[in-house]
Curated annotation (Swiss-Prot):
Record NCBIfam families: hemA (TIGR01035), PRK00045.1-3 (NF000744)
Gene that encodes the chain: hemA
Binding site for NADP(+): 189-194
Keywords: Chlorophyll biosynthesis, NADP, Oxidoreductase, Porphyrin biosynthesis
Domain of life: Bacteria
Protein's name according to its UniProt entry: Glutamyl-tRNA reductase
Organism lineage string: Bacteria, Bacillati, Cyanobacteriota, Cyanophyceae, Nostocales
Top-rank EC class of the record's enzyme: oxidoreductase
Gene3D superfamilies associated with the record: Glutamyl-tRNA reductase, N-terminal domain, NAD(P)-binding Rossmann-like Domain
CDD domains for the chain: NAD_bind_Glutamyl_tRNA_reduct (cd05213)
């Protein structure tokens, strides 16, 4: 059995490709069901964010498992395999383990050290368990990755003052608009990213903010979190009217198709009316054809790289400190992983000795006859079970604790030969 990850990110694919492969949370259950239906995939977890899609698997035959994931991604995105491959990365076992640790710690993010990814990894773990994709191995891996991510944030300073996608978008808006206080700002959506947008806009001096959302309750709930600021809320049918009165529009909704395009804007904007759109959603909320309109500028998550680069160099040295912590968590997972290959030998040995115990106990009880009371039988049952457990305890502890791979394998082979054990598949 081996761990592998197949994926793409802001490093390997532009947003127009990433949005085709995005798996929104409502589609996670069916995606996991389809992936686990393939013959070579035993476990699966799906991490889908605006900047990455990564599918983690446990497979007996790694090459076959990777091919099955690639086929799934091709069908899901409706992109042929040959054009998809140029954007995909594939990492096997040690590299896959290192990767999820770095992802959880924010070291692989567009915004180095950003904190939102840890919550996204946690949600991936939760959904994987909920929909029966995650079992023993990925459960342990994701728990270790979450521990790594938390340690990096509490034991290093990399998360202090880290920019996020939302703050980078506001930073870009400030560069383009110069004076946010003079701008009428509209935010489409009322989720976590929108909350961060409001937070950063307010800190940069924005005072005229409107929130447009499908649910009035969610929009009002968000506005209440910033009750000291006069934030207006609107429902979706009012969206175009509100946009027509705006200077800046930020989009952060879960829509899977563009909700703004040239035709919609042409209907409400005056000729040559300036408007800047900042789309931090994947899939994108803003169609590329809006750039054909005079005085309309649209920016997406890939346009944030220049803003993020200013922050990167100062955080790179902090990342080196974080990498040392990750090595400790990787080693802890590796020790656990290597102990897995002892499981089949230990299980087989315990099963064989338990069978002998039961057979010999049955013989003894039959000789003692029916007059031998139940209470005495329970005592003898407990006695024999205790003897077996005590005899097996030290050999099993020593076998699991043996960190030298070759020495441990020699011990297992000796046990298998001496006790004539029939063991199943070994972990590699």
């Amino acid at each position: 059995m081996n761990i592998a990850v197949v994926g793409l990110s802001h490093k390997t694919a532009p947003v127009e490709i990433r949005e085709k492969l995005s798996i929104p949370e409502p589609q996670t259950e069916s995606a996991i069901a389809q992936l686990t239906s393939y013959p070579h995939i035993d476990e699966v977890a799906i991490l889908s964010t605006c900047n990455r899609l990564e599918i983690y698997i446990v497979a007996g035959e790694t090459d076959h498992g990777i091919r099955e994931v690639t086929q799934f991604l091709s069908e899901h995105s409706k992109l042929p395999v040959h054009s998809l491959r140029q954007h995909l990365f594939v990492l096997l076992h040690e590299d896959a383990v290192m990767h999820i640790m770095r992802v959880a710690a924010g070291l692989d993010s567009l915004v180095l050290g950003e904190g939102q990814i840890l919550a996204q990894v946690k949600n991936t773990h939760k959904l994987g368990q909920q929909y029966n994709g995650i079992k023993t191995i990925l459960n342990r891996l994701f728990k270790q990755a979450l521990t790594a991510g938390k340690r990096v944030r509490t034991e290093t300073s990399i998360g202090t003052g880290a920019v996020s996608i939302s703050s980078a978008a506001v930073e870009l808006a400030q560069i383009k608009a110069e004076n946010l206080a003079a701008c009428r700002v509209t935010i489409l959506g009322a989720g976590k990213m929108s909350r961060l947008l409001v937070q950063h806009l307010v800190s940069k001096g924005a005072t005229q903010i409107s929130i447009v959302n499908r649910s009035r309750e969610r929009a009002q709930e968000l506005a209440k979190q910033f009750s000291e600021h006069p934030i207006r809320t609107h429902l979706l049918p009012e969206m175009m009217t509100v946009i027509a009165e705006s200077h800046l529009v930020f989009t952060s909704t879960s829509a899977t198709e563009p909700i703004l395009d040239r035709a919609k804007l042409e209907m409400v904007l005056a000729p040559n009316q300036p408007l800047m759109l900042f789309d931090i959603s994947v899939p994108r909320n803003v169609h590329t054809d809006v750039n054909e309109l005079a005085n309309v500028q649209a920016f997406n998550v890939d346009d944030l790289k220049a803003v993020v680069a200013q922050n990167y160099e100062s955080r790179r040295k902090m990342a080196q400190e974080a990498e040392r912590l990750l090595e400790e968590e990787i080693e802890a997972f590796d020790i656990w992983w290597r102990s897995l290959e002892t499981v089949s030998t230990i299980s087989s040995l315990r099963s064989k000795i338990e069978t002998i115990r039961e057979q010999e106990l049955e013989k003894a009880l039959s000789r003692l006859g029916s007059e031998f009371g139940d209470k005495h039988q329970e005592v003898i049952e407990a006695l024999t079970r205790g003897i077996v457990n005590k005899i097996l305890h030290d050999p099993m502890v020593q076998l699991r604790a043996q960190q030298d791979v070759e020495a441990r394998r020699r011990c297992m082979q000796t046990l298998q030969m001496l006790f004539n054990l029939d063991v199943g598949e070994q972990f590699s």
